[in-house]
Amino acid sequence: MKQNNLKPKLGQHFLIDEKIKKIIIDSVKDTKNKNILEIGPGEGAITNKLIDISNNYLGIEYDQSLCKKLSGRYKKNPNVKFLNEDAGIFDVLKLKNYIPNDYILVGNLPYYSSNKIVRNFISSSFKPLALVVMIQKEVANNYLLKI
């Protein structure tokens, strides 16, 4: 990561495993819904592929420098937007300004805030149709215990 001038902070962990990337993309590519919200796109490890399979794409990135970089990279695509926001406290109803109807939430969530982010979106009246997220094993086990 140092060679790419990346300095993970804020609990970030950057997705580099090609097998995991493929699993995530395969999980959403055949769905009828093509509105995709990506939480924490970071350097854009799966962003291109998500954009290729979506009608509307919105990325929420907390790191201002990464958000600016991604916004510049995709500025010519009118169906792609990035917001510099904290997904854990983001007003989910604002999504309707960018994604007009049902959406799928995809993300490689920061460990320290994954619970807060997931709860923010599933407790909203504008819930995602599906979540395809990578989270810490202990957080996943905690969700399973509550079901």
What are these language model-derived features?
Residues 1-147:
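Catalytic cores of RNA-modifying enzymes
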